């Protein structure tokens, strides 16, 4: 693999429009326990799964086309992704999160890891009938809408409250959740929670507390102390990815750095974990492209 990666990088440096690879078809060994790089067959060639080639494509910031069979092998084509890395969370402009704009093209619920990990977090929260659920930075309410799939018998009894700076995001929420028991408002979450807000049973904030235009830790402490019931749970989401040409790219990348740097992400995770543990919550962390931290009652 080292020589393959080096050759592909050289081709991209020379601004190749695509990379063509002829590789072994791994299909005959699909039911066997074989590790990538393990010698197989009479020629003792290194085994490489399609997942490895997909990972190579991601490392190169490319999109892999559908493999085409050719004489017992596969032809792979890798195409450089267009555009620039998208990091809306670093912008101070609320319109960047317009659900009808670029941000609206991103559907995290199409990521199986996101769905699986979010569901694992919800299972730790023990949501009962008539639960009150608060979302800070709600956008179009994806994290609320998906609850219908996992709580079919109690979903209609949940009441949702969501705040966001984007007027268009709040309009989307009103369309998705028209019932009068739900509350969605344009609000700066840096402000204190509304005094009339009932105590909530679950606070959700996904990819919001890391925005550069708010003091995320201070905001969280305020809402945690003033808006939640003593037995409430918390689910926080932290982006561990960016987007390039419509593809999710693994790893949190800082500006002016060509590679992922998880240092800020790890620092934030450790802060929120310690804070919630100090306040008597059981805390766990999971995730891939998005890391979830869940704090639930012990």
Pin down the residues of each PLM region.
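Conserved Class I S-adenosyl-L-methionine
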Residues: 247-273
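N-terminal accessory interaction module
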Residues: 1-90
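Class I SAM-dependent methyltransferase Rossmann-like catalytic core
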Residues: 68-127
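A short, conserved alpha-helix within the catalytic core of class I
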Residues: 211-223
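Conserved beta-strand signature within the Rossmann-like core of class I S-adenosyl-L-methionine
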Residues: 231-240
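A short acidic, Gly/Pro-enriched loop at the edge of an enzyme's catalytic core
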Residues: 194-203
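Class I SAM-dependent methyltransferase SAM/SAH-binding core
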Residues: 134, 142-191
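Conserved glycine-rich SAM-binding loop
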Residues: 139
